[in-house]
Amino acid sequence: MSEHRDTVEIVNNRGLHARASAKFVNAVAKLGDGLHVRVEKDGNDAEGASILGLMMLGAAKGDTIDITVSGEGADLALLKLVGLVKDGFGED
């Protein structure tokens, strides 16, 4: 099983709040079966499929998070998730 990891900065003004977390979870759900996503900040981690878990990380603008994706196609899945974060979750 392959595992890929990247560190990305939170760029949207409100950080990893409810709407941003929901967009991340929806993106994880669209990745398909067989992939596992974890998000870590400051030694705390959350399942990529958990809105509440992501919000509890308390990631604010300027913070960095580590995204780890494991499973078949993890490299492409990670690129999609990192792109979402770098795009500020589509927020202004």
What are these regions (language model features)?
Residues R5-T7, R38, T64-T68:
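Beta-strand secondary-structure signal
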